[in-house]
Each structure stands twice: as C-alpha cells, then as structure tokens.
Amino acid sequence: MSSDDAIIIRCPFDCEFAGDSISFISHLTTIHNSSVQTLAKNAYLCASEIANELNQNPNLKDQEILLLQIAQENSLKRVLRQQQKERREGKIKSLQCLFCNNEGLLNRQEWFEHSFHVHGLNIGLADNIVYINRLLEKIKNELESFRCLCCHVPCKNKKLLREHMNNKRHFRLDPKSSEYDEFYIINYASVTKSITISHSQFAINEDINETDDTISDINDEDAEPLSVECIFCTNFYEPVFCFEHCKIVHDWDIKKIQKDYSLDVYGAIRVINYSRKTKKKSIPAETDSFWKEPGWLIPVVPDDALIICLSEVIEDPRL
C-alpha cells in the first residue's frame, strides 16, 4: 500500500473493528465510550496515531487529552514526512491537468502553477498540501460527476459546469466543508485546539450565498469583506490592506521577510503568529527551536484573516 493510500485502522481493544480514520473515531465513541471526538472535532486526522498509542499504552484511554496531544504531535510529523516525500517525487512529470484534454503530464509545481494561472483553480499553495494524489482523485471525481467544487450545484454536462464555475468564480473548494481538511497540513497542528484552518483559508476566501440547485446570477462580490486587527496596533483593515498598513506604518513586510529568510508558507505563518504574540518585528534565529515547535503553526487569533489570505498576498506581484 502506498503512503498516499487511505489507512485502515484496527481497534486496539478486544474487538474486530477495522476501518478508515473517521469510522475508527466513531467506533471509539460509540463502542468504547471515548470522548476524543468531543474534545477535538478533527480527532480523525490523528486516528492512526491514537490507535498506535492505545496499543502501546491502553491506560491512555483514561487520559484522553494527553492521548490527543501525543497523537497530534506524531500525526504532524507523519504528514510533514509525507510531504517531503511528495516533494521529492513531485519533480517527476506524473500529474494530469484536471481540465485540459491533452495528455501532457506535469510535475507537482507545474501542476499547481498551470491549474491556477491557466484555469484559475485555487486550492492554495503546493506547500500547504499533503496526500496530493488522493486529493486530485477526489476533485476529479467531483468534476466528472458535473458538480461544482465550491457550491456542489449539479450541472447537466461539462460545458455547463465550466460556465457555472467561471461565472461564479467557483474554481475553488467549498470553504464551508471539512471533507478536504485531511489534505492541508496546517489542520494537523490544531487538532487539540478544536480550531480547523480549512482549505478555504489558503485560497481566496469568498462567502457563499446560494441555496438554489440551479445556476443563478448571484455575484460573490456581494459578500461582506473580511476584517482583521493589525498585528501591532488596534486598527482594523481588510487583510490585504492590513499587510500594507504593517509594511508602511510599522515597517513590517511579510513578503520581504519571507524572501530574506527563504521561508515557505509555514514559516510565514509562524512569523505572523510570533509577531502577534510578542509584538516583535524581529524574528528568531535560524537555530532557534521556534522553527520546529508545532505550536507556532496554531493561530494566535482564531480564524486569523491574515493567515486566511496569506497565499493571495504572497502570489500577488502588486503587493
């Protein structure tokens, strides 16, 4: 079985259950009276680690917060290792565009750039994604069913689906759904806080205001804009303007910091959280444990709009 395949988990207790991560957590809840799902709504993200820990130490069943903390740390290590593996293998041209009819294959980075710049598909940066093959298969199945990725409106054919997604700017994943959470590494860092930064927070965030099952003329531009408090003062701005405000008024430029220190998106998230918490403009030394501690990936401000819009700012050459 490939490391990109879904994992089958066996119950660590005296029963014959074997299933996927969501079924396993449900099994622990209903059969073994576990509270892990109540404590952490995304406990399934570290389900295999929970099973491993309970196999090694069944007494952790009565210390569920500790169990979740250990499992979260190990699951984060797992997906970071997996992502490194995918990056190495991603240099090979093995990915097919989901929209083009030609048979040309792309490497990992080419696929993300092509999908975004040619088709406008915005699922975030390559650095955010793990289990890429399963993610693309899931997206492909949705498209082949002629269902919109964002609002799930059914269309009669491929042509109408493309027209709908173009008109509505729906070449992105549903920001209200958690079904893609397992493919975004940042979610593995926030399991025990019951805070889920979903795929929508690494794409252009636009509220959905649709209930009709048919194509409508409602424009997403009517959505109320996000507002966020400045990192260094109490003023509120839309995220892009907040980054500009920090650059001009507070001499804190996230794009310059990212470039000067060769940071990926996770490094930039760490810096945002660090500056929010400490109010410092300088960042820790390269050898500091700060760069390895998973806790700095967890937002200091829940649903921080600066993190939500980070990829948009990073990719925008005008900013």
Swiss-Prot record:
Coiled-coil ranges from the UniProt annotation: none
GO cellular component, as recorded: cytosol; nucleus
Localization: Nucleus
Main localisation: nucleus
PROSITE patterns xrefs: ZINC_FINGER_C2H2_1 (PS00028)
ZnF bounds (C2H2-type): 146-170
InterPro entries: ZN622/Rei1/Reh1_Znf-C2H2, ZNF277, Znf_C2H2_sf, Znf_C2H2_type
MF terms in GO: zinc ion binding
UniProt KW keywords: Metal-binding, Nucleus, Zinc, Zinc-finger
Family note: Belongs to the ZNF277 family.
The protein's name: Zinc finger protein C19B12.07c
Source organism: Schizosaccharomyces pombe (strain 972 / ATCC 24843)
